[in-house]
Design a protein with these regions (language model features):
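Glycine-rich phosphate/diphosphate-binding loops that line cofactor/substrate pockets in enzymes
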Residues: 1-2, 54-58, 63, 89-101, ...
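N-terminal amphipathic/basic leader segments beginning at the initiator methionine
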Residues: 2-55
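Active-site histidine-anchored catalytic micro-motif
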Residues: 6, 11-13, 27-28, 77-84, ...
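Cap/lid and interdomain-hinge subdomains that line or gate substrate/regulatory clefts
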Residues: 60-62, 71, 109, 136, ...
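Hard-cation-handling environments
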Residues: 202-402, 407, 411
C-alpha cells in the first residue's frame, strides 16, 4: 500500500510597523486537491515537494489546505481565527491515515492575537496528526523560527537564496528529509544557534555578499549523509516578535555533535561580519539632487515602502521631494491608492482628474495633489517574472502628470520585478528614473541596465534604518538596536527521537 503524504501550507511575511492589518480576503486560499493542482509547473515549495514525492514510486500525495498572501501588516483577529481554524480542520480527516506531512510556511507571519502563528499551527497539527507522524516544513530565509516550531516538527528546509529563487528546491529538500525518515529510519536532531543581530544591505545578497559565504557552506553540507537540512535565517527585522533574531538551523541524522560544530562555525563567521551587513542609505534630498544631474536611467530603491517586506506601498516620499525640487526627468512611480483608482475609473480613459496620491493607508506620508490624465486601466491581475505567484492588485490605473507616470494599485502587491509595469503597458527602460519598491531585485530587472541604483533613506514601515522603527517586543540587547551587544553562542537542541 502506497505511503500517503499530506501537503498543506499557510504563509505571509509581515511588517509589525505597517499600521494596516491584513484580512482573510487578502489571502489566496485553496482546499483539497487544488493545493497541488495550483502549484504544478511553478517554482514553488509545493511543486518541489511533489516532484520529489512522485519520484519515490510508492507515495500517494494528498493535500488539504493552503493560504498565502502578499506581505503586509499583521493579520487581524478574525482573519487569523478563520485561517487557523480552516488549516487545522482540513487535517482532521487525515488523522491516522498518513505516513508524514509537509507544510509550506514562511516564518515571519504574525497576527493581531498570535505572535507565533506557525508555531501554533505546528503545535495543534501535532495534536491532530499524532506524535509519531514526521512533519517537515519550509521557511523563508527571512523567517523567524521559534522554539515551538522546532519542538513540534522534525525538521525545516530554509531558502538558500536572497533574492529568493529556490522555492521549489526548498520544498524538495523538505520532502527528501521526510522520505529519509519514512524509508530509511533516520532520526532527526535539530541544532539551532540564535544570534542577536538584525541585518540589512547588499552583503545579504547570497550570490555576491558576505552572507552568501555562510549560506554556501551550509548548502554544501547537504552532500554529507549526516545532514538532513541546514540553513541560515536572518529573520525579518520588521516582524517585531519575541524570538526575532538571526539564526543557524542544522538538522542531522542523530548527530548532535556534528550539528553543533557546523552551526557554531556558520554563526560565529556571521557575527564577525555584522558591521558590514547594513544598508548604505543615501539621504532623500541628496538622492534626488544627484539623480537630477545624471544621464540615467536611474533606479531609486525605496526599500522603506517595499510591499514584499510588509509595507503598505503608499509612500510618496521620493516623488514629493522630486516635485518640491522641480525634478527635470521622466519618472515611473508605483503607488497604492484605492481612492485615486476609484476617481480615475469613474472619469475614464483620457479623462483629466485632480487627486491626492499617497498617505491613504500609512499616515506617516502626506498626500500630494496632482493633476493627471488617465492613460489606461486594468484589473491588476498578472504573474510575476520569476516568483511563483499571481498578483492581484485590484483595479489599477496609469496616470500621467507632467513628467510623472504613476501606476496606481488598489492593493499592495509584490513589486520585486518589472511585471507590474509590463502588465500595464509600460517598459521601465522608457523612463529616466524608476522608483523600485523592493530592497533587492534580480540584477537583470533593473541594475544591469541602470546607470545607478540609489538606495534611498526614505521613511516607511520597512526602512533599513532599523533604529527608526521602534522595536518593543523582540529580545534585547540586539544589534544594531543596542550598543555593545555580546554574542555568546548557545546551541539549542531539539529532537523527537
Amino acid at each position: 500500500m502506497a505511503k500517503r503524504i499530506l501537503i498543506a501550507g499557510a504563509a505571509q511575511e509581515v511588517s509589525t510597523f505597517n499600521p494596516v492589518f491584513s484580512t482573510y480576503e487578502d489571502f489566496n486560499v485553496s482546499f483539497g486537491d487544488e493545493v497541488v493542482e495550483r502549484a504544478l509547473g511553478k517554482n514553488s515549495e509545493v511543486a518541489g515537494m511533489v516532484e520529489v514525492l512522485q519520484g519515490d514510486g510508492d507515495v500517494e500525495i494528498v493535500s488539504s489546505y493552503s493560504a498565502g498572501a502578499t506581505s503586509a501588516g499583521p493579520l487581524d483577529k478574525a482573519g487569523w481565527e478563520r485561517i487557523s481554524s480552516e488549516f487545522l480542520e482540513s487535517l482532521k480527516p487525515f488523522a491516522g491515515e498518513i505516513a508524514g506531512a509537509l507544510f509550506a510556511m514562511h516564518g515571519s507571519m504574525s497576527a493581531e492575537t498570535e505572535l507565533d502563528p506557525e508555531g501554533y499551527l505546528l503545535e495543534e497539527s501535532r495534536k491532530i496528526l499524532g506524535e509519531e507522524i514526521p512533519i517537515v516544513y519550509t521557511q523563508d530565509i527571512h523567517g523567524v523560527t521559534t522554539a515551538k516550531m522546532l519542538k513540534h516538527a522534525d525538521g525545516v528546509a530554509v531558502y538558500h537564496t536572497y533574492p529568493h529563487v529556490d522555492f521549489a528546491d526548498s520544498g524538495a529538500r523538505a520532502a527528501r528529509q521526510l522520505l529519509r525518515q519514512i524509508n530509511d529510519g533516520v532520526k532527526p536532531v535539530t541544532v539551532r544557534v540564535p544570534i542577536p543581530a538584525l541585518v540589512r544591505g547588499e552583503q545579504l545578497i547570497t550570490e555576491t555578499g558576505l552572507f552568501g559565504n555562510q549560506v554556501s557552506y551550509l548548502k554544501s553540507l547537504h552532500d554529507d549523509p549526516r545532514i538532513l537540512n541546514a540553513g541560515f535565517q536572518i529573520g525579518n527585522p520588521f516582524t517585531d516578535v519575541p524570538e526575532l533574531c538571526s539564526q543557524v538551523i542544522v538538522v542531522t541524522d542523530n548527530d548532535e555533535a556534528f550539528g553543533r560544530e557546523v552551526a557554531l562555525k556558520a554563526a560565529n563567521e556571521f557575527w564577525g561580519n555584522r558591521f558590514e551587513m547594513h544598508a548604505d542609505l543615501v539621504p532623500l534630498e541628496e538622492a534626488v539632487a544627484t539623480a537630477s544631474k545624471m544621464k540615467g536611467p536611474i533606479e531609486f530603491s525605496d526599500a522603506a515602502d517595499a510591499p514584499s517586506s510588509g509595507a503598505s506601498g503608499d509612500s510618496n516620499a521620493i516623488v514629493a521631494e522630486m516635485i518640491r525640487t522641480g525634478y527635470p526627468h521622466t519618472v515611473l512611480a508605483p503607488i497604492v491608492d484605492p481612492s485615486a483608482v476609484v476617481r480615475a475609473v469613474e472619469k475614464g480613459i483620457d479623462g483629466r482628474i485632480t487627486v491626492k496620491l499617497g498617505g491613504n493607508l500609512d499616515k506617516r506620508f502626506t498626500p500630494i495633489e496632482v493633476k493627471a490624465t488617465v492613460i489606461s486601466a486594468s484589473d491588476g491581475t498578472f504573474p510575476l517574472e520569476k516568483w511563483p505567484s499571481i498578483e492581484h492588485a485590484g483595479p489599477t490605473v496609469v496616470l500621467q502628470s507632467d513628467n510623472y507616470t504613476f501606476v496606481v494599485f488598489s492593493r499592495a502587491i509584490n513589486l520585486v520585478d518589472r511585471a507590474p509595469f509590463f502588465a500595464n503597458g509600460l517598459d521601465p527602460k522608457d523612463f529616466h528614473s524608476i522608483i523600485v519598491k523592493s530592497p533587492f531585485c534580480e540584477p537583470e530587472f533593473f541594475d544591469d541596465w541602470c546607470e545607478l541604483n540609489i538606495i534611498v533613506d526614505a521613511p516607511g514601515s520597512t526602512s533599513a534604518d532599523l533604529l527608526s522603527l521602534g522595536h518593543t517586543i523582540c529580545a534585547r540587547p540586539m544589534f544594531p538596536l543596542d550598543d555593545d551587544v555580546e554574542f555568546n553562542a548557545e546551541p539549542q537542541v531539539y529532537s523527537r527521537v
